[in-house]
Amino acid sequence: MSLPILDQLEEKIKQAVETIQLLQLEVEELKEKNTTVEQEKETLRQEYEQLKSEQQSFQDRLRSLLGQIDNV
């Protein structure tokens, strides 16, 4: 192989390595974002369950009050 061909090959290899490194960084960033989103999802799920429970309590109290009104 001639020297220019080796230089071209070396340059292409360097570019490929740089691209791989950039993609690895991007993958790490996406993993971190995914972790954050999963945590937010879990927080929202817990909040939803709490609100659902509160709603059920309010409905039960309202039914009880309506029942008392009906008895009057």
Curated annotation (Swiss-Prot):
Compartments where located: Cytoplasm
Protein origin, superkingdom: Bacteria
Principal localisation: cytoplasm
Coiled coil: 5-71
Keywords from the UniProt entry: Cell cycle, Cell division, Coiled coil, Cytoplasm, Septation
TM helices/strands, residue ranges: none
GO biological process: division septum assembly; FtsZ-dependent cytokinesis
GO cellular component: cytoplasm
Database matches in HAMAP family: ZapB
Function statement: Non-essential, abundant cell division factor that is required for proper Z-ring formation. It is recruited early to the divisome by direct interaction with FtsZ, stimulating Z-ring assembly and thereby promoting cell division earlier in the cell cycle. Its recruitment to the Z-ring requires functional FtsA or ZipA.
Assembly with partners or alone: Homodimer. The ends of the coiled-coil dimer bind to each other, forming polymers. Interacts with FtsZ.
Membership in a protein family: Belongs to the ZapB family.
Protein name: Cell division protein ZapB
Protein source organism: Actinobacillus pleuropneumoniae serotype 5b (strain L20)
Upper classification of the organism: Bacteria, Pseudomonadati, Pseudomonadota, Gammaproteobacteria, Pasteurellales
